[in-house]
Amino acid sequence: MRQALPLVTRQGDRIAIVSGLRTPFARQATAFHGIPAVDLGKMVVGELLARSEIPADAIEQLVFGQVVQMPKAPNIAREIVLGTGMNVHTDAYSVSRACATSFQAVANVAESLMAGTIRAGIAGGADSSSVLPIGVSKALARVLVDVNKARTTRQRLTLFSRLRLRDLLPVPPAVAEYSTGLRMGDTAEQMAKTYGITREQQDALAHRSHQRAAQAWAEGKLAEEVMTTYVPPYKNPFAEDNNIRGASTLADYAKLRPAFDRKHGSVTAANSTPLTDGAAAVILMTESRAKELGLHPLGYLRSYAFTAIDVWQDMLLGPAWSTPLALERAGLTMADLTLFDMHEAFAAQTLANLQLLGSERFAREVLGRAQATGEVDDAKFNVLGGSIAYGHPFAATGARMITQTLHELRRRGGGFGLVTACAAGGLGAAMVLEAE
């Protein structure tokens, strides 16, 4: 094992995560229908600051992400600063790493803290699958550019006459990988077939996710980290995730047909994460700054790792690659962890990564490591459920996982937790967290 890389400032301060918050997550076109991601981001950051009682000028940087970006607000981070009453001089910029976007935002703020350029910052992400940038066809887009340069009405009419009726149809955002044309569900089907993951195993994991999430809400474990929201016409509160199946039964999952490979597939809408709207954010600062402000951190960022693999086959294996690297940098092994939380993009993807984490052959032949990362103890794995139940607003999921894991570590008396996610483009992310 290589030497651990301590995540500390020049003065030896640890990177503290002092608080975290998210909106409830809503299925597409339900509670947050018509609410853009930038407004969801403003909601969560404004409430996070209000609850923390941190002086507004204490936050020196905001790094925020959005995967499905809107042309009207390309820098969501800056819009959040301007729309929440934060100091107008607060540095703010946006990031995107697909489903690992808020992992990246957290890492960026942590790096600023370690560099000594700031002492406190906010990281997070928001996405809306209900407010989408509906585009136009390539043919219409080209004509519109040319029309803008045309000098006469006749020239403009000539340009428009080249269009066919189909060229006028709206174009929704792409759901496939740009480089391969494969949808995420197609990749999940690849992984199910490659690693021999059955439909029954996938449905069982989805059922488990919903059961755990429903239990977490019933026991009040999420109340502190999920805000109550009000949206126009501001009559009814929305306070709990609305995708969770409170009365989940395995028999219900078996009724659904495959969603991607309709003849021979096993990936369904029920064992996949749904399109979701929501936002989440965390406040990070140096350990000494937290003490100055009289704050008691939720926990600390011990290490992080980002990885990338090929996109043509089984590209959602990011956790199997990034987890051993994050553990190594933290100076820990799988056995040292109290909790292990993995983003459930699909049940097939989750089960494939779990399988490879325990595989000696994968470790030796693919990762070039002497031994497997380690089997994940079911008693430590996604103990409060995962994205299949909660939903997945792309840029917000990482911040949800970090906040949720730190709260659960504290309930258990402290320890180490690892959070990890796959992402489009063959990317992977993992972070080791510590709570006392």
Swiss-Prot record:
Disulphide-bonded residues: none
Domain of life, per lineage: Bacteria
Catalyses which reaction(s): an acyl-CoA + acetyl-CoA = a 3-oxoacyl-CoA + CoA
Alphabetical UniProt keywords: Acyltransferase, Cytoplasm, Fatty acid metabolism, Lipid degradation, Lipid metabolism, Transferase
EC annotation from Swiss-Prot or TrEMBL: 2.3.1.16
Pathway as given in its UniProt record: Lipid metabolism; fatty acid beta-oxidation
GO biological process: fatty acid beta-oxidation
InterPro entries reported in the protein's UniProt record: Ac-CoA_C-AcTrfase_FadI, Thiolase, Thiolase-like, Thiolase_acyl_enz_int_AS, Thiolase_AS, Thiolase_C, Thiolase_CS, Thiolase_N
Active-site residue numbers: 99 (acyl-thioester intermediate), 392 (proton acceptor), 422 (proton acceptor)
MF annotations from Gene Ontology: acetyl-CoA C-acyltransferase activity
Coiled coil (UniProt feature): none
GO cellular component: cytosol
Keyword set includes Lipid metabolism: yes
Subunit structure, as described in the record: Heterotetramer of two alpha chains (FadJ) and two beta chains (FadI).
Function summary: Catalyzes the final step of fatty acid oxidation in which acetyl-CoA is released and the CoA ester of a fatty acid two carbons shorter is formed.
Entry similarity comment: Belongs to the thiolase-like superfamily. Thiolase family.
Name used for this protein in its record: 3-ketoacyl-CoA thiolase
Native organism taxonomy: Bacteria, Pseudomonadati, Pseudomonadota, Gammaproteobacteria, Enterobacterales
